[in-house]
C-alpha cells in the first residue's frame, strides 16, 4: 500500500482516495494486480496482451463466437499494471490535462479493472479505438446481447456510479459462475 500511496502522491491524487477505499467507503474498489497472466495475442496496435487465466479462456470463447457470427471483435488492451497506469496519467498531466478530467476517463493507479487481468478494451473494424461511437456498431450490440454468456459485463455504462465517463468499449470478466462459455 505504501508504493501505491507514493504513486498517488507523485500524481497529486488525494490521500483520502486510498483511505476511503481501504475502509470500504469508496464507490471505487481497489483492484489488485493479477498474480498470474497468460498471453492472449496482440492488440490492434501489434502489442502483446495478457489476461488472467479464467478471463483469457472466456475472452477466447467470446472472440471465437463473435467471429463465427461475422462480428469483428478486436482487442485494444488487456492487463495494465499499476505502474503503467501511473505512467498513463503522468503523460496526460505532462500534456497539460487537468487531473479531475483525467480521472473521468482513466482510473487512478490501484483502481483500474485492467490491473486484475480481467478487463478488456475492444473495438471493431472501421471504428476508432476508445471512442464512444463504438456503441453504434454491430460489435457493441453483439456484446450487449452475448458478452454475459462469457462472463463479461459493461462496467461503465452511461451515468455509472463510479463517476467514470461512458466507456462502451470496456468490458470486464466477472466470474466463471456468470459465464456460460465452455
What spans do the regions from the language model cover?
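Extracytoplasmic cell-surface/polysaccharide-interacting catalytic and binding patches
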Residues: 1-78, 83-182
Amino acid at each position: 500500500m505504501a508504493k501505491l500511496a507514493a504513486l498517488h502522491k507523485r500524481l497529486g491524487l488525494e490521500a483520502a482516495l486510498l483511505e476511503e477505499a481501504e475502509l470500504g467507503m469508496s464507490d471505487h474498489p481497489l483492484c489488485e494486480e493479477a498474480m498470474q497472466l497468460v498471453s492472449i495475442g496482440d492488440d490492434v496496435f501489434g502489442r502483446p496482451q495478457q489476461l488472467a487465466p479464467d478471463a483469457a479462456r472466456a475472452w477466447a470463447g467470446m472472440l471465437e463466437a463473435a467471429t463465427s457470427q461475422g462480428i469483428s471483435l478486436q482487442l485494444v488492451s488487456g492487463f495494465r499494471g499499476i505502474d503503467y497506469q501511473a505512467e498513463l496519467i503522468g503523460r496526460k498531466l505532462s500534456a497539460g490535462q487537468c487531473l479531475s478530467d483525467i480521472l473521468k476517463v482513466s482510473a487512478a493507479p490501484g483502481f483500474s479493472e485492467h490491473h486484475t487481468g480481467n478487463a478488456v478494451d475492444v473495438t471493431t473494424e472501421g471504428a476508432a479505438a476508445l471512442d464512444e461511437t463504438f456503441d453504434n456498431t454491430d460489435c457493441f450490440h453483439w456484446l450487449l446481447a452475448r458478452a454475459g454468456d462469457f462472463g463479461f459485463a459493461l462496467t461503465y455504462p452511461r451515468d455509472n456510479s463510479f463517476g467514470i465517463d461512458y466507456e462502451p468499449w470496456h468490458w470486464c470478466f466477472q466470474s466463471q459462475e456468470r459465464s456460460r462459455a465452455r
